[in-house]
From Swiss-Prot:
It catalyses: tRNA(Ser) + L-serine + ATP = L-seryl-tRNA(Ser) + AMP + diphosphate + H(+); tRNA(Sec) + L-serine + ATP = L-seryl-tRNA(Sec) + AMP + diphosphate + H(+). ATP binds at R273, Q274, E275, E360, I361, S362, S363. Keywords: Aminoacyl-tRNA synthetase, ATP-binding, Cytoplasm, Ligase, Nucleotide-binding, Protein biosynthesis. Homodimer. The tRNA molecule binds across the dimer. The gene is serS. Pathway: Aminoacyl-tRNA biosynthesis; selenocysteinyl-tRNA(Sec) biosynthesis; L-seryl-tRNA(Sec) from L-serine and tRNA(Sec): step 1/1. It is found in: Cytoplasm. This is Serine--tRNA ligase. Its EC number is 6.1.1.11. L-serine binds at T242, A243, E244, E296, S396. Pfam families: Seryl_tRNA_N (PF02403), tRNA-synt_2b (PF00587). One of its GO terms (cellular component) is cytoplasm. It is an enzyme of class 6 (ligase). It comes from Oenococcus oeni (strain ATCC BAA-331 / PSU-1). GO terms for biological process: selenocysteine biosynthetic process; seryl-tRNA aminoacylation.
Amino acid sequence: MLDIKYLRNNRDEANQRLIDRNVEDGVLDKLLADDEKRRSLIRKAEQLKAKRNQVSDQIGAAKRAKDNSAAQKAISDMQTVAGQIKDLDKQLSAIEESVHTQAAHLPNLADPRVPVGPDDSYNVEQRKWQPTDLQGRPAAFSKTPTWLKAHFEIGEDLGILDFQRGVKVSGARFLYYVGAGARLERAVYNFMLDEHRREGYTELLTPYMVTNESMYATGQFPKFVDDAYEVGKNQSMTMIPTAEVALVNWRRDEVLDESELPLYITALSPAFRQEAGAAGKDTRGLIRLHQFNKVEMVKFTKPEDSYNELEKMTVDAENILQKLELPYHVIRLSTGDMGFGSAMTYDLEVWFPTQDKYREISSVSNDEDFQARRGHIQYRDSKTGKLRFVHTLNGSGLAVGRTVAAILENYQNEDGTITIPEVLRPYFGEDKISKENAR
């Protein structure tokens, strides 16, 4: 949620920054016009309530003076004022709902350092990394080897990814991990969680269903309600699209102790997504599923520390890819490509040799006080004694299924086996996956 005072006091600047976020020109004008109506109604209501108090005093004085005529007139005036107040309250309730709805659909404003542009073609690469010794792996070849297979083909050949039965049981974009596939997925997320714990994150095991209020606090609702899986009576609960929702809401409606900040938390959870806008995209494989595992990182910080913490969180995500020795690059997203609640986002994209391109595997964002305002998450400043909104940061560390897919593609061998990355071997228990040990 944006600060309405900032929008009022910096109208032109705010309007341009919203246009940069692909908000239509005129949307802010409508919001501020309704906000002024709301404030005008509040002033009128306050004046009428003050008048009601005066009339109440007049009634009391007239009764004490036994002036029945004056008392009856004052009572009549009271009834008139009460009716006016009731009418104003109705108008005020309607305009407040309108203002709140409009404000809830406005995205966060981008940090000035974010590249301005309407789409992903304006994203800017920050850095690129690959292992120094690729040891004959696919990325080492200047030309794609003829034996190279897509991750879903490898998985099906080895019998470790079962898409056909996933579709039979649940429909499109579902699968079973089988044998070594399930063990590899488990090895990957246990490795990720251990790495984040070493970096100071506290691990949580969260609910997988949350209230609509929780989805509102993190910015998923109301704008993206069609992308969510709503469940329960009257659709009062939602399956989480990311552990970010449960992690941020862990401290919703709370005042944190300043000594707790920065607070680092992490969780593994399934993510449930409708993928409403993904028709025809990535119809095969692990890239785009309705249910997938993801390790999420969240931070609560003081405002002055949040961008330094954003850089640290990005490094924490990069650390996973570097230890897995997977080639990747980091891009800074443009104003038109960032998520709804973000003020700045870095995407980490890992190399997929069969696609000859990088694919997103992590998105790391600073939402500044956008979520904290919606979720009423504050801390008391020890110097001023005043309450301040925290800044919240979130990042994938990483999407587990996409990491498995990247490993299958980047560690495949000509004989059809998969070499297990060295850091995963203590978790997986073997150094290769072959047809002999796939189950």
